[in-house]
Amino acid sequence: MPVFAVLSAIVFWMWVRARRAERPLKTRPRPHAEGERRILVIANETVGGRTLREMIRERSEGVRAEILVVTPALNSPLRHWASDEDDARAAAQDRLDASLARLASVGLRARGEVGDGDPLQAMEDALRTFGADEIILSTHPEGRSHWLERGVVAKARERFAVPITHVVVDLEAEQEEVRG
């Protein structure tokens, strides 16, 4: 009997969480002056890609942009359940620091944070405090992107009431261009 009660509670909790995730998150951007834009960037391994930097620069041209870069701390399911997220958070922080330095080198001021391992939850957490005007969501190309396989871009567009620009960053092609 106790096993049934525990399993029932877990199923109910998962159902409630799934229902909550289905509703679009209404964000309240902070009022800002004409010519200002708040850009939320969500990227993991692609956070340092040239294509993403170019998109951020393009979206912030001609305006005073406030940019928040969030790098989800992706972890293996086993490490997640064992509450062992230190390595994942440290790796995400390293990628984030390198990306912020690259953005600064091309004249873009941004701040960053390591987010939840679930990119949708990382977006929601950031939107609750940042109030973005738009989201730039960066992934690997199709066939190499776990986020595309899981439908993260489509789910984000359904879930959040903020315009989303999807940027595909092919890090291998960018490295070949540098070597070539």
Q: Model-derived features: where do they sit?
A:
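Intrinsically disordered or low-complexity boundary/linker segments at protein termini
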Residues: P2-T51, A161-G180
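Small/aliphatic-rich secondary-structure junction motif
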Residues: G35-S83, H166-V169
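A short acidic, amphipathic alpha-helical/loop segment
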Residues: L52-M55, A122-A126, V152
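Structural beta-alpha unit
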Residues: V106-E134
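Glycine-rich, Arg-bearing micro-motifs that act as flexible, cationic patches
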Residues: T139-K155
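Protein-protein interaction modules outside structured cores
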Residues: R157-R159
